[in-house]
Curated annotation (Swiss-Prot):
CDD domains: 7tm_classA_rhodopsin-like (cd00637). GO terms for molecular function: G protein-coupled receptor activity. It comes from the Eukaryota. Gene3D superfamilies: Rhodopsin 7-helix transmembrane proteins (1.20.1070.10). Not detected in the brain regions thalamus, putamen, caudate, frontal cortex, pons, hypothalamus, hippocampus. GO terms for biological process: G protein-coupled receptor signaling pathway; glucose homeostasis; insulin receptor signaling pathway; negative regulation of insulin receptor signaling pathway; positive regulation of multicellular organism growth. Glycans are attached at residues 2, 8. The gene is GPR21. It is found in: Cell membrane. This is Probable G-protein coupled receptor 21. Pfam families: 7tm_1. The chain crosses the membrane at residues 33-53, 76-96, 105-125, 148-168, 192-212, 253-273, 284-304. Keywords: Cell membrane, G-protein coupled receptor, Glycoprotein, Membrane, Receptor, Transducer, Transmembrane, Transmembrane helix. Belongs to the G-protein coupled receptor 1 family. It comes from Homo sapiens.
């Protein structure tokens, strides 16, 4: 009787979301749907961003493009890494044992998310320097220093999470879709505090400090410009139109950055601290907060890139190039279509 019961339990796959399991399909349906959906979204979104940067050379003239492309590649690798738990949930055999697979997956995703988060902080620092020191900006921020900064971001992110292989504790809940990670690999309060103090807290403080000061400086500049325009209009006797306040645009960017960052990451960080300090875990909470934070891999480049008019033009060129290639292929297959001798407009990628 006991052996039969054990056999029935062992036939059921391990599911963090127990209510997502269906007997008919014999896998964790809800987990698979969520992870596969986010994987497709992250991969496709960041591939588009990378292609647009290759399609619009003007984007590469901006220093922030170095960090945005770093974010795009890091987030793309996050999406590719998420294929591993997707295949595991669909009962595909793992190349190595489950314990090593989930440790490597948790470490890789943690490092990639750290690179993405550090790039966000570096973008805010770059914009802060551009506004506070516009005359010396080109001498302070050089391509060589940007490449060095990106290298240090990857190195620092790797070093922060490397102790997870030396029994310091679990770096996060990314690998908890594997049973060994969820049940046998536990968090440590000291290692969790170390990660928060070395990564999450500094990144949040830098973003808040820099964008708050950017907003304040731009608001002061707008006020000065409005006063000068009013003084000039009163002296000339003409009522000139006051230009639209540019601080509104900065306020919206500030709102998007801070709100998305905290909405997606704060629940994960809070649960990470509470679970490691109290020892009480909740599988539903860990899954929800973890994949909510991972979804930021899709939001990062969307927030920064879609706010750029040059990026939007590059996206139009990319879509135009795809339509042109489809049209030219259709024309080549149709012998009755008159072919134009002029060059095709589009983006050569």
């Amino acid at each position: 009787m006991n052996s039969t019961l054990d056999g029935n339990q062992s036939s059921h796959p391990f599911c963090l979301l127990a209510f997502g399991y269906l007997e008919t399909v014999n896998f964790c349906l809800l987990e698979v749907l969520i992870i596969v959906f986010l994987t497709v979204l992250i991969i496709s979104g960041n591939i588009i961003v990378i292609f647009v940067f290759h399609c619009a050379p003007l984007l590469n003239h901006h220093t922030t493009s170095y960090f945005i492309q770093t974010m795009a590649y890091a987030d793309l690798f996050v999406g590719v890494s998420c294929v591993v738990p997707s295949l595991s949930l669909l009962h595909h055999p793992l190349p190595v044992e489950e314990s090593l697979t989930c440790q490597i997956f948790g470490f890789v995703v943690s490092v990639l998310k750290s690179v993405s988060m550090a790039s966000l902080a570096c973008i805010s620092i770059d914009r802060y320097i551009a506004i506070t020191k516009p005359l010396t900006y080109n001498t302070l921020v050089t391509p060589w220093r940007l490449r060095l900064c990106i290298f240090l971001i990857w190195l620092y992110s790797t070093l922060v999470f490397l102790p997870s292989f030396f029994h310091w504790g679990k770096p996060g809940y990314h690998g908890d879709v594997f049973q060994w990670c969820a049940e046998s690999w536990h968090t440590d309060s000291y290692f969790t505090l170390f990660i928060v103090m070395m990564l999450y807290a500094p990144a949040a403080l830098i973003v808040c400090f820099t964008y708050f000061n950017i907003f304040r400086i731009c608001q002061q500049h707008t006020k000065d410009i409005s006063e000068r325009q009013a003084r000039f209009s009163s002296q000339s006797g003409e009522t000139g139109e006051v230009q639209a306040c540019p601080d509104k645009r900065y306020a919206m960017v500030l709102f998007r950055i801070t709100s998305v960052f905290y909405i997606l990451w704060l629940p994960y960080i809070i649960y990470f601290l509470l679970e490691s300090s109290t020892g009480h875990s909740n599988r539903f909470a860990s899954f929800l907060t973890t994949w909510l934070a991972i979804s930021n891999s899709f939001c990062n480049c969307v927030i920064y890139s879609l706010s750029n008019s040059v990026f939007q033009r590059g996206l139009k060129r990319l879509s135009g190039a795809m339509c042109t290639s489809c049209a030219s292929q259709t024309t080549a297959n149709d012998p009755y279509t008159v072919r134009s001798k002029g060059p095709l407009n589009g983006c050569h990628i």
